[in-house]
């Protein structure tokens, strides 16, 4: 069997080797911007709300690696104040203000929310502050999905980006692999081994409704959503060796995109509808690109003898991947505009990268836990989970 399929199989076995995790996550920022971040004073919110809104905002901003939250009595570049009081039509009115060092008002907004939405609105405030001061969309209000296993079961889990509010949306006595979010964040496609054979399933996140979209003989693997959310690309071996197929979700018949004697697998879509995938057609696993309907493949990677598990940033600018060097595995990124190739991580067991919806962070697993690193390598986060977690995927922004 080809080398990278051997590694794929070994990683499959590892998924089931950890103890049961109840998906309790905490996140440590292990590397931030030089200088410790932008000082920002955050005062406790008045009004006696059950959630510590100021504390959530401070944690969110600290986790970005770009801010250094301070107590309100410390001189800082920016200051956040607010109130969360019973009232309004939904239960609570939350107001906040962001001011500059000279007292200039930068933001002054209010939200009418039910009591169970105080934490989400705190994340919303964090993202508004982050975007106002950096020019980039924030990630505090987003979600992640991942797989964990133990006790003879596998779990597909969704949690907030800060690791809170984990929810198991699927429990199975057979492996679960390769979750992928739909572009609107309402569905997850994944590989399930129910019935002791691989099949590709699409599950509605909010209702739990499930639909098997491919259960062909042999391999059914690595589902990836098209940008319009109406198609999936995945790997099938029903006609012999693994090839890339595309399926219109309104049709039962997948269309074959690659055709040859090589192993073609792990497809992901670019915004223009073309597909990047892993193939050993050149003698070792490398990344290639084909058009929306297939055709001639263009090789994209030439650094080293192993580049696999591609993931594409939302704007198509970057492709992150697993890069092998000296028998160890790292996360690397290829700039599609400049063709610059950079290795971002220093560990040796990196796997399964996916981009955050703002394209600035990449989440991945390292064999024990989840990690995230910025595209420029300047910010690194460790997700501390009780037990092992694999196959992380960052959800898109809510629409």
Where are these regions (language model features)?
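A structural "domain/chain start" motif
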Residues: 22-63, 150
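Multi-bladed beta-propeller domains
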Residues: 160-177, 203-221, 226, 247-265, ...
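Structural motif
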Residues: 91-93, 152-157, 197-201, 241-245, ...
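Amphipathic beta-strand/beta-sheet edge segments enriched in Tyr/Trp
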Residues: 74-128
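Residue-level detector of Asp-centered blade-edge/turn motifs that repeat once per structural unit
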Residues: 138-140, 183-184, 227-228, 270-272, ...
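Residue position within the beta-strands of beta-propeller blades
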Residues: 144-147, 187-191, 231-235, 275-278, ...
